[in-house]
Structures are given as structure tokens and as C-alpha cells.
Amino acid sequence: ACIGVFSLVKIYQHEYIFALWLMFITVVIDAVDGTLARLVNIKKILPKIDGALLDNIVDYLNYVITPCFFLLVKPGMLPPEYSVFLIAAVSITSAYQFCQCDAKTPDHFFKGFPCYWNITILYMFIFNTSAATNAIILIILSILIFVPVKYVYPSRLDYLTESRILKILMHICSIIYAVSSICILISYPNTNIICLSLSVAYVGMYLFLSFYRTYYP
């Protein structure tokens, strides 16, 4: 949560790369915090703390509010005449996503687009897409929140496959994705084609697996 607030500060100060670094750190923390909590049996240690509620509060800050603020503050990200409506659409549909009782399915998938808005704006920023293109992307992803596709939960792969080897390969791919994202941020404003290709390939693989497991369980 603290890093999310610092991200907002850096966005306000127009230090966009610094803000993206901080947002990347929040994604890494989110990827491992649940695993670490289960590893130490945090429910037993802190029985009166609702970890799931805290996780949702922090995730809404980091995955929704911070990216929305980025889109509003950085010039050229959205068409000025539609920016308020687009941000309203993103924030309201995301609130719906977070409030669903089955937003995370019993077999550990996300139902509907899982509000990866921080990752979305990273690619908008790196590819320098036009405001009109960004608007279309935001509208499509907001609609996908209501489409019951089961998106892979990267840190919980037990129901994705029974193969231990495939699970290990998925974790390796996730690590490669993280490293490639780091290289992309380090290289900016230059473009590291290899790292960018690896990053986009991972997103493609993630979407393929999600749609495949939805329609061919």
C-alpha cells in the first residue's frame, strides 16, 4: 500500500518511469505475498486479521486507482473530452470485479478480466499508443470484466495442470517475463526488441492458456 501511494506521488511529479518501477514492485509483491502468507500459516498467527480483505484493498489501489491516475495525469494517454468517462468506466467495472463473490473461482482462476490495468498502461507507455487506441483498449478490457473467461492465477497453478514439469515451466516463464519487464524499463526510451518480444509473448501465452482452460477444461 505504501509503495502504491509513492507511485501516486511520482505520477503527480511527472516522474513516469519511476512510477512504473514502483508499480512493477507492487506486482512482484502481489505475486508472492499470498504464497508467503500460506507458507507461514498467517491465519493462525493473526486470526483476527482478514488477509483477503486487505489484499483486495491494496490491489484496488495498485491495480486500479494508480493506473487511472497515471492515465489522467500523463498527457496524451487519453482523449481529453472522454478521459473522465473512460476513467469512470475503468474504476466502476473494476469495483464490480473486486466485489464479486466468485471473482476468484474455487479452482483458483480469475473470472473475467482481472484488472491488470497497471500492466496495460505499461504497454501503452512503451508502445506510445495513441489516445484513441488507448480509449478503445480500455473499453474492450472493461467489457471483458463481465465475460466469464477463467484467467490463469500465475502463482496458483494447481488447477491449471497436473504436470509438475508444466508448472515449473510456467513459473520459469513468469520469471522470464519479470526479467524482460525490468530490461524494458531499464532500456527506456530505447527499445530492447528481445525483451519486449519475450514480454509480449508471455502475455500471448497467458491469454491462450486462459481461454483454452475456459473452453477446454
Swiss-Prot record:
EC main class here is: transferase
- Give the signal peptide, or none: none
* Chemical reaction(s) catalysed: a CDP-1,2-diacyl-sn-glycerol + choline = a 1,2-diacyl-sn-glycero-3-phosphocholine + CMP + H(+)
List, alphabetically, the GO terms of the cellular component aspect: plasma membrane
* Enzyme Commission number: 2.7.8.24
Periplasmic domain ranges by topology: 9-16, 72-77, 129, 186-191
GO biological process assignments: phospholipid biosynthetic process
**InterPro entries (UniProt xref):** CDP-OH_P_trans (IPR000462), CDP-OH_PTrfase_TM_dom (IPR043130), PcS (IPR026027)
Q: Among its keywords, does the record have Cytoplasm?
A: no
The answer to keyword Transcription applying to this record is: no
What GO MF terms are annotated?
phosphatidylcholine synthase activity
Subcellular location(s) of the protein? Cell inner membrane
* Entry keywords, A to Z: Cell inner membrane, Cell membrane, Lipid biosynthesis, Lipid metabolism, Manganese, Membrane, Phospholipid biosynthesis, Phospholipid metabolism, Transferase, Transmembrane, Transmembrane helix
- Annotated membrane-spanning segments are 1-8, 17-37, 51-71, 78-98, 108-128, 130-149, 165-185, 192-212
- Pfam families, alphabetized: CDP-OH_P_transf
Query: What is its membrane topology?
Result: Multi-pass membrane protein
Q: Which residues lie on this side of the membrane: Cytoplasmic?
A: 38-50, 99-107, 150-164, 213-217
Q: Which prosthetic group or cofactor does it need? A: Mn(2+)
Provide the primary localization. Answer: membrane
Instruction: Explain the purpose of this protein.
Output: Condenses choline with CDP-diglyceride to produce phosphatidylcholine and CMP.
Say which family it is in: Belongs to the CDP-alcohol phosphatidyltransferase class-I family.
According to UniProt, the name of this protein is Phosphatidylcholine synthase
Q: Which organism is it from?
A: Legionella bozemanae (Fluoribacter bozemanae)
